[in-house]
Amino acid sequence: MFAKDAQLISNSYYTATAQALPQQPSLQGHIQADVCVIGAGLAGLSAALELAQSGFQVTLLEAKRIAWGASGRNGGQAIVGYACGEEPFEKAMSMDEAKRAFNLTIEGLDLMRERIRQYNIDCDWVDGYMTA
């Protein structure tokens, strides 16, 4: 991680309001797993959950704490599309492939909604949109 990124994390709302966690020992010895997921941000947690639900024995490793990096620095918005916009996708692939890539972001939001319902997560989800 770059020093600039570390400062962003230490000055984030997430860091300022997160409850202190008890120290956990580093992983010692050997463990057995079908899959090891490294990083417990939204992507890593999602991958680990999906794999575990499919019957795999999963080990999830995180250096800091859950959602410590980019997942903890956002303002809580889950928005369709990509930060770079659609143009790079349209240049790199066919229009059908670019549309499929965009549709993956819609499916991602649908999956988040489903998991919120499935696990009864109290997160004050509000559907909306942003324009700038």
Language-model-detected regions and their locations in the chain:
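Dinucleotide-binding Rossmann-like beta1-alpha1 core, especially the glycine-rich loop
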Residues: 81-132
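Conserved catalytic-core motifs of eukaryotic protein kinase domains, centered on the activation segment
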Residues: 70-72
